[in-house]
């Protein structure tokens, strides 16, 4: 019992630390707005994600309370905290299963996909070369794929719709997805998903998740525009792709194949 309570206490205190940092981040956005570069906001947000994992508060409590423990492990108190810890564990398992089910859907969808046409693969390899990506990345098409997306940490894969696209439109989509890969957004989204699983009880944890997703897209757009050359053409293509996804539940890219 004591071990489970200690684990939950460390997780709870790390949630408090991460949440305080997130409030600071929101204050920066409100009062400084465009005075700080987007990449700085994104970097701070990534540090906040890590803070939700680091039990800094738990360690400080033990250091400054004479190597003792802030909670009294006797009688009713330990029983109450044990019950709370069990409730947290049940919620964490349920959230993991929920994300796991989404991951399973993507893996199943991958089995339904097929290799792209040769000219698409050539364009894909040219874009990879231009972005300086050497790792082998699979590119597939599927009839159930509505919008381009990237999935996989160990075996990264880019999924494209079957519909024929103009070469410039196709390049824009590929640049966008490969930029996500180059920026390690799949990894960070995986970190964010695990954060939600651990801190599911926190009312604003999904807001942190959404902000990480939004800023990943912002930084990706700013980076990809440089390869496309025209901001207007880039955002026109992105807008058209997003319109096609209306009413369709897009799968997240944090998948561990």
For each predicted feature, which ranges?
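Membrane-embedded and juxtamembrane structural elements of multi-pass membrane proteins
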Residues: 2-257
């Amino acid at each position: 019992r004591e071990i489970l309570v200690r684990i939950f206490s460390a997780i709870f205190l790390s949630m408090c630390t991460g949440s305080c940092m997130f409030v600071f981040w929101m204050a920066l956005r409100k009062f400084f707005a465009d005075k700080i570069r987007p990449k700085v906001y994104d970097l701070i947000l990534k540090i906040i994600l890590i803070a939700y994992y680091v039990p800094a508060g738990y360690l400080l409590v033990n250091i400054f309370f004479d190597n003792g423990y802030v909670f009294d492990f006797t009688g009713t108190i330990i029983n109450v905290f044990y019950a709370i810890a069990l409730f947290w564990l049940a919620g964490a398992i349920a959230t993991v299963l929920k994300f796991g089910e989404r991951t399973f859907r993507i893996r199943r969808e991958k089995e339904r996909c097929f290799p792209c046409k040769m000219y698409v693969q050539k364009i894909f390899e040219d874009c990879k070369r231009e972005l300086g990506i050497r790792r082998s990345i699979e590119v597939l098409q599927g009839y159930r794929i509505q919008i381009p997306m990237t999935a996989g940490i160990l075996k990264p894969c880019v999924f494209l719709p079957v519909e024929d696209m103009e070469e410039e439109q196709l390049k824009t989509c590929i640049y966008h997805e490969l930029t996500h890969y180059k920026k390690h957004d799949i990894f960070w989204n995986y970190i964010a998903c695990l954060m939600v699983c651990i801190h599911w009880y926190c009312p604003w944890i999904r807001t942190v998740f959404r902000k990480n997703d939004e800023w990943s897209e912002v930084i990706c757009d700013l980076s990809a525009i440089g390869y496309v050359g025209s901001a207007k053409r880039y955002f026109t293509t992105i807008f058209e792709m997003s319109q096609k996804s209306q009413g369709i539940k897009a799968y997240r890219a944090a998948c561990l194949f």
